[in-house]
Amino acid sequence: MKPFAAIPPVSVDTLVPAALGMAPQHPAAARVIAFFEALTPATLAQLEEIYTPQVYFKDPFNEVRGLQEVRRIFAHMYEALEQPRFVVTDCIAQGDQCFLTWNFEFRFKNFDRTSLQTIRGGSHLKFTAGGQVDFHRDYWDAAEELYEKLPLLGSLMRWLKERARR
């Protein structure tokens, strides 16, 4: 095993989101961050500027290929939730890919409409030579970040979690 000092450094551009007052240095990542932080139902029409027509997208609930399917997922988000918004908290980019960490904030439409909910997650994105996203994989814990917050199901999830710890 090499001593730590003998391992050559890796060139990685660490990006700070624009929300923190610093502009990212990776143009494709900067464009994606700006797009998602300003996402509205009206801007869904601009998804083709961000994604390729054959984009692969996966999150805990969906696994799809194609721009129209991705558009459908985001349109459903606006139908099901009140005031959904993404806040990018960090970004690491290297070459043709980046990893974003983010907070997804929203209110439920059908219950507990007063409480702001936050899901913390991350996205692995791969870009084409033209800077469009061709691969988008979201990582977040649906059990902890969503199911535990739902009435009835939340109680069951917390009980199961406690049982698993024993």
Label each region the model flagged.
Residues 1-45, 49:
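Short, low-complexity N-terminal intrinsically disordered segments enriched in polar/charged residues
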Residues 2-18, 79-85, 92-166:
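A beta-strand edge to alpha-helix "cap/lid" segment located at domain peripheries
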Residues 22-25, 53, 101-102:
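A short alpha-helix capping/helix-coil boundary motif
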Residues 27, 69, 117:
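Soluble or luminal CAZymes and related metallo-dependent hydrolases
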Residues 30-31, 61, 125:
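Short, contiguous strand/loop micro-motifs
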Residues 44-98:
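A solvent-exposed, acidic/Ser-Thr-rich amphipathic alpha-helical stretch
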